[in-house]
Amino acid sequence: MAIEILRLGHRGERDKRISTHVALTSRALGAEKIIFTEDDKHVKESVERIVESWGGEFKFEVVKSWRTYTRRFKDNGIVVHLTMYGENINKIMTEIREDISKTNKNLLLIIGAEKVPREAYDLADYNLSVGNQPHSEVAALAIFLDRLTEGKTLYSEYDDAKIKVTPSKSEKCVFVEKD
């Protein structure tokens, strides 16, 4: 199963920091690609620097129409929309994992930066809430991906990484490859 993240409504200068965090969280917790509906050189360069240093295969893509992309994806994939108005994650997560496992389909996860168009709710196979109180989309994304992978991606490492961290009780243990 490949996981892709579709970021709706990125607002340039206003959202560059949070959108960068969305991308980094996506990568760190197992996604293979993040898709934006507007190009942002700052976010793209930040993602590319992280991939260069920390390794792995994570792609940044821009699409003209999120609707077209989602419809095409849905033909052979499962679409989950994270929204505080959706079904309770505690009640629906097992069903989502089973659906993915049974069908062997890829996953497109939709998260919004601003008000999400009604059509996103209609296109989604699942509208899922991670709590029903206001919070960051980064928090919702992290919780969802961790639950989806059952914690298996928390300590991912990549063979091509130039920087690696070893968990330690009392000190920083960082390996940095010299050029």
UniProtKB/Swiss-Prot annotation:
Subunit structure and binding partners: Homodimer.
Family annotation (InterPro entries): Alpha/beta_knot_MTases, tRNA_m1G_MTases_N, tRNA_mtfrase_aTrm56
Q: Which domain of life is it from?
A: Archaea
MF terms from GO for this chain are: tRNA (cytidine(56)-2'-O)-methyltransferase activity
Principal place where this protein is found?
cytoplasm
User: What is the catalytic activity of this protein?
Assistant: cytidine(56) in tRNA + S-adenosyl-L-methionine = 2'-O-methylcytidine(56) in tRNA + S-adenosyl-L-homocysteine + H(+)
A Pfam family annotated for this UniProt entry: Trm56
What family, per the record?
Answer: Belongs to the aTrm56 family.
Q: Which is a GO BP term held by this UniProt record?
A: tRNA nucleoside ribose methylation
Where in the cell does this protein reside? Cytoplasm
- Its EC number is 2.1.1.206
Its Gene Ontology cellular component terms are: cytoplasm
- Which residues does the annotation say bind S-adenosyl-L-methionine? L82, G112, A113, E114, K115, V116, V130, G131, N132, Q133, P134, H135, S136, E137
Keywords, A to Z, come to: Cytoplasm, Methyltransferase, S-adenosyl-L-methionine, Transferase, tRNA processing
Job description of the protein: Specifically catalyzes the AdoMet-dependent 2'-O-ribose methylation of cytidine at position 56 in tRNAs.
Query: Which organism does this record belong to?
Result: Methanococcus maripaludis (strain C7 / ATCC BAA-1331)
Keyword Ribonucleoprotein assigned to the entry: answer is: no
- This chain belongs to the protein called tRNA (cytidine(56)-2'-O)-methyltransferase
SUPFAM superfamilies (alphabetical):
alpha/beta knot
